[in-house]
Design a protein with these regions (language model features):
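Basic- and aromatic-lined ligand-binding clefts that recognize polyanionic substrates
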Residues: 92-108, 205-265
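Extracytoplasmic substrate-binding proteins
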Residues: 169-239, 334-349
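Structured C-terminal subdomain patch of bacterial secreted/periplasmic proteins
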Residues: 287-349
């Protein structure tokens, strides 16, 4: 298969210059995950994993000691400097949001008894038969509904957990809480996922996840073939009178794992928002450097603007739809996104 040799970073006010980076093969991605796992195993998972098995069993919903140590039953992990004590092998897991949390719970092969539900998410088809739809919403979790499933573990993404804590909506008094870390930047999801699976004594699960992701990348690469050889793609979005270009994000990392040249412009991003760069509808020249655009919100009014319609890839009909449920997540979502990108670039034929 023809190889795309580099991922280029372009800037709208200067001539593009290529910075060559070798294509990541399936073996490269596999080696990257292996290095992560081995490193995490040697060093432990932040400060908390060094203490795995060293503390007695304390229920997260009780401040009293059981009086006996049961280290085989519990595991300690650290997320954002907070330590959480969790059951090593939970029996009744409730998932509070249907994106990163559900992705992780499915990857970890947890016995899910109930989950928040998003009918538009590709993850729903992977939910085990018999799992119930959790009452309440992401914004307003329903404690009564959660309790009705008698959970021994709650799973929630870090962003939502922070929101619940800020609003005083949910605590650890119902059951122990696994706060899913999706990475400090969108492109660090692999390291965060591998770290948590390893910390939870699920290294073998992490290895299976790696193999599945590599296999999906290989299938997607084969389908893309030489369609994008020597070409670039942009991962973008439209809203609020602007078009934005993704830089250091989940979707960009998956495209790069596919070996694609991805147009980015971190140099012109706001200092506090380096993951994407935003442009007014009058300054869209950078997008002419892309041969294909994967666009979030393609039905937005901004996508109907005359300046956007003059972008080269738009004129050529080389625009795909970045679905909301594929824009962020962990390995299951990454696999679905890789397959979706391979399908959508077929318009280049």
């Amino acid at each position: 298969m023809p190889v795309i040799e580099s991922t280029k970073t372009f800037h709208p006010t200067v001539s593009p210059s290529a910075t060559e980076t070798p294509l990541q093969s399936t073996k490269d991605v596999d080696d990257e995950f292996t290095r992560l796992i081995d490193s995490l195993t040697r060093r432990g998972f932040l400060s908390g994993a060094a203490a795995l098995g060293a503390l007695g069993a304390l229920s997260a919903c009780s401040s009293e000691s059981s009086g006996t140590e049961a280290s085989d039953e519990w595991v300690d992990i650290v997320v954002a400097d907070q330590t959480y004590r969790l059951p090593r092998d939970p029996k009744r897991v409730v998932v509070l949001e249907a994106r990163g949390a559900l992705d992780f719970a499915l990857l970890a092969e947890y016995p899910i008894v109930a989950t928040n539900w998003d009918p538009k998410s590709q993850l729903m088809q992977k939910v085990p038969a018999g799992a119930a739809r959790l009452g309440g919403t992401n914004n307003e979790p329903n404690a009564e509904s959660i309790l009705s499933y008698d959970p021994d573990l709650l799973v929630v993404g870090k962003g939502w957990w922070d929101y619940y804590q800020d609003k005083g909506l949910l605590g650890t008094d119902i059951a122990p809480v696994l706060v899913v870390d999706e990475g400090t930047t969108g492109s660090s999801w692999k390291q965060a996922m591998t770290a948590q699976l390893t910390a939870l004594d699920r290294r073998e699960v992490a290895e299976r996840v790696i193999a599945r992701y590599n296999a999906e990348l290989a299938r997607a690469r084969a389908k893309i073939g030489g369609l994008l050889e020597g070409k670039s793609i942009a991962i973008a979005g439209a809203d609020s009178g602007q078009i934005w270009l993704q830089n250091n994000t989940f979707a960009v990392s998956v495209a790069q794992d596919l070996g694609l040249n991805v147009l980015t412009d971190a140099a012109h991003a706001a200092p506090d928002r380096k993951d994407s760069t935003f442009y007014s509808l009058e300054e869209l020249a950078i997008f002419d450097q892309a041969d294909f655009v994967l666009l979030q919100n393609p039905d937005a009014v901004e996508a109907e603007s005359p300046t956007w319609k003059r972008v080269r890839a738009v004129q050529d009909g080389h625009v795909g739809h970045l679905r909301y449920d594929l824009n962020n997540g962990l390995a299951l979502t990454a696999m679905a996104l890789a397959a979706d990108i391979a399908e959508q670039v077929q318009v280049m034929r």
